[in-house]
């Protein structure tokens, strides 16, 4: 397959190459770095991954990742519990948190909708969202899906789904470029998009 002729090393390189942002060359460098000091580097990584796997759970309310069943955001008494931002994944939640400009709650969908693949809307956590909106007396829902075609499709579907709830529905400002994803934007851009959010039409 390659120069090493070692299936185990090939498998390690392959696994790293599947991580976001890593190609085969970067994966090969990481694998070599770990194997050159296997007893320290590789074992330390393995032990830490095992511990993380034991501790990290999905928040049963919003879908964030934390060490408790209710994440620190949902359990905080300092958050504005009348506003909820809908994000596609935890990556977008983290991006909004890095901006330091959003103090409300979140709802992680876990997916988006693609017209091309004809995904079933049931993959989204919308029944849970509607239940939260009524139970927590939500006043504003900020749709913070990405500015991709899939994100826009998802946003329109969410708006239709929430029609029976009286909350104001807004969308992040158009400063986010078309096709842009929150996770790749700097904190200033995300902060401005939150501040300048507009009613969803």
Swiss-Prot record:
The gene is recR. InterPro entries: DNA_Rcmb_RecR (IPR000093), Rcmb_RecR (IPR023627), Rcmb_RecR_Znf (IPR015967), TOPRIM_dom (IPR006171), TOPRIM_RecR (IPR034137). A zinc finger (C4-type) spans 59-74. GO terms for molecular function: DNA binding; zinc ion binding. Residues 82-177 form the Toprim domain. May play a role in DNA repair. It seems to be involved in an RecBC-independent recombinational process of DNA repair. It may act with RecF and RecO. Belongs to the RecR family. One of its GO terms (biological process) is DNA repair. Keywords: DNA damage, DNA recombination, DNA repair, Metal-binding, Zinc, Zinc-finger. Gene3D superfamilies: 3.40.1360.10, RecR Domain 1. PROSITE patterns: RECR, TOPRIM. It comes from Rickettsia africae (strain ESF-5). HAMAP family: RecR (MF_00017). This is Recombination protein RecR.
């Amino acid at each position: 397959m390659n120069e090493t002729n070692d299936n185990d090393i090939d498998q390690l390189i392959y696994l790293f190459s599947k991580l976001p942002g890593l190609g085969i060359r970067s994966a090969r460098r990481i694998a070599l770095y770990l194997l050159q000091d296997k007893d320290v580097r590789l074992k330390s990584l393995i032990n830490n991954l095992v511990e993380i796997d034991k501790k990290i759970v999905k928040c049963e309310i919003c879908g964030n990742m934390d060490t408790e069943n209710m994440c620190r955001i949902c359990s905080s008494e300092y958050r504005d519990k009348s506003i909820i931002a809908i994000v596609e994944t935890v990556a977008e939640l983290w991006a909004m948190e890095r901006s330091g400009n959003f103090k409300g709650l979140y709802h992680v969908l876990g997916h988006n909708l693609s017209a091309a693949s004809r995904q079933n809307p049931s993959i989204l956590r919308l029944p849970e969202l509607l239940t939260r909106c009524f139970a927590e007396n939500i006043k504003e829902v900020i749709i913070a899906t990405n500015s991709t075609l899939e994100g826009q499709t998802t946003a329109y579907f969410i708006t239709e789904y929430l029609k029976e709830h009286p909350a104001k529905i807004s969308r992040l400002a158009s400063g986010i470029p078309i096709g842009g994803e929150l996770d790749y934007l700097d904190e200033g851009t995300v902060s401005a998009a939150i501040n300048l959010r507009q009613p969803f039409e």
